[in-house]
């Protein structure tokens, strides 16, 4: 149910873009979003067992945080080199979409930032920063819907065992929606006006701390 709260948050922030897609569904942006979704679905289905094991064990969390940091730094470096020749939405190609969608598939792993990797992919392809953020969050819609469908059976079984959808679930969903609205707006502003270097440093330090705890201190892992 938390996924639904996040989905509503995306709709709240990007309602103009979503309405434009609904009014004119057979436009190029729709085709790009579909193309980007294909590799995500393929990766999710092909590595389903591996992904579930990663979620349950948590053994790869530290490396995933570090990998996210490296990708973000690399994307910002590439984007800075080509800042004078930024490509717009009209310039995005289907290979661009496939690359971004593949990164979204990789980001199914628990400690990999979906928005971070997809935005980084767009920046690495020299796409406009504002469009990179918009495309990333629009692309999250089919991904979130897929996750909801994928977990529908577990949700139904949990609801039946617990006597229905309880107050904590409702509160969690509403909280996810409120936090999601703030997170989407904040991320889009950072991407448009700033840099992902701060977030890269954060996840990099977090990755080091997690690895130290997993292999030395064992306070949490």
Describe the residue ranges of each PLM region.
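Multi-pass membrane proteins that catalyze or facilitate reactions on polyprenyl-/lipid-phosphate substrates
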Residues: 1-221
């Amino acid at each position: 149910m938390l996924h639904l709260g996040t989905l509503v948050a995306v709709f709240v922030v990007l309602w103009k873009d979503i309405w434009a897609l609904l009014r004119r569904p057979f436009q190029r942006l729709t085709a790009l979003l579909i193309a980007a979704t294909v590799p995500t679905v393929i990766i999710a289905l092909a590595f389903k067992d591996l992904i579930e094991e990663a979620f349950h064990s948590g053994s790869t969390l530290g490396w995933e945080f570090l990998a996210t940091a490296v990708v973000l730094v690399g994307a910002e470096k590439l984007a800075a080199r080509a800042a004078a020749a930024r490509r717009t939405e009209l310039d995005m190609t289907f290979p661009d979409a496939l690359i971004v969608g593949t990164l979204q598939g990789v980001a199914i792993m628990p400690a990999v930032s979906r928005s971070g990797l997809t935005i980084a992919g767009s920046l690495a392809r020299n796409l406009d920063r504002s469009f990179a953020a918009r495309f990333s969050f629009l692309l999250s819609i089919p991904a979130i819907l897929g996750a909801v469908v994928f977990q529908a059976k577990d949700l139904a079984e949990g609801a039946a065992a617990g006597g229905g959808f309880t107050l904590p679930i409702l509160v969690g969903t509403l909280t996810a929606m409120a936090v999601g609205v703030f997170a989407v707006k904040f991320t889009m502003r950072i991407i448009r006006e700033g840099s992902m270097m701060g977030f890269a440093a954060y996840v990099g330090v977090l990755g080091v701390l997690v690895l130290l705890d997993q292999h030395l201190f064992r306070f949490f892992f």
